[in-house]
């Protein structure tokens, strides 16, 4: 007994006419008749009483109709449950990311997600950490990748990604380039190039200088790492950045110097997740791929 046979049987029972039933299930009348006959042969009893003018259910047919309708309803419910999940994954996944987040190969991650869920639209927003945190908390973003932060009032979940030291970048002709280390006190009065205060590396740098008890001057503020590195190349200032910035092609030729003294400067990145609401199905799927990629 096959589901298709039950569908054919129910169509004939409801239409009480083989031609109309065949049109309803989009098969030929001969094909429908053959399907019903095969079902009757399997059950070893007639299901319909046929005349030239009418088609009526037999007692066995009436008994089968109740169970057939129940079976087909269960199959539809199962399909709808799966379709509901697939429907959510056909929606939109809003992802926020700060530039050059450590411990994350976002293009590869999003490519894997797109391959696994090709009908889901990915909306990627590149913003500063503070804005990303607000976006997740307010529901504008499903998930974000940013610097580790703990702003007042934030009650979300942070899943650590990476932790790395921060280094000073300067042009080869700068006075600090003569050594691979520099005391915090030596940095007082130096013009710095840094990100907007909304960005994670800027927050980490500000915290490091506060911890060291050194006041610094941010001469130029940027919103992208490429501009920052170009300005350092042009000797318009130095920069305190996450170590992986120094390995970028645009940083080639710059000198990396490790600050030392009252504590060390570190940059930490994390996945920003909501706490007040459940993760969206898309965000859960992305997190699963991230764990597979990082082995965590």
What is the predicted role of each segment?
Residues 40-62:
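A short LG(V/I)-centered, amphipathic sequence patch enriched
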Residues 128-141, 147, 198-257:
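Hydrophobic hinge/microswitch elements
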Residues 12-31:
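Short helix-boundary/capping micro-motifs
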Residues 39-40, 113:
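Conserved amphipathic alpha-helical core elements
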Residues 155-192:
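Flexible hinge/capping segments at coil-to-helix
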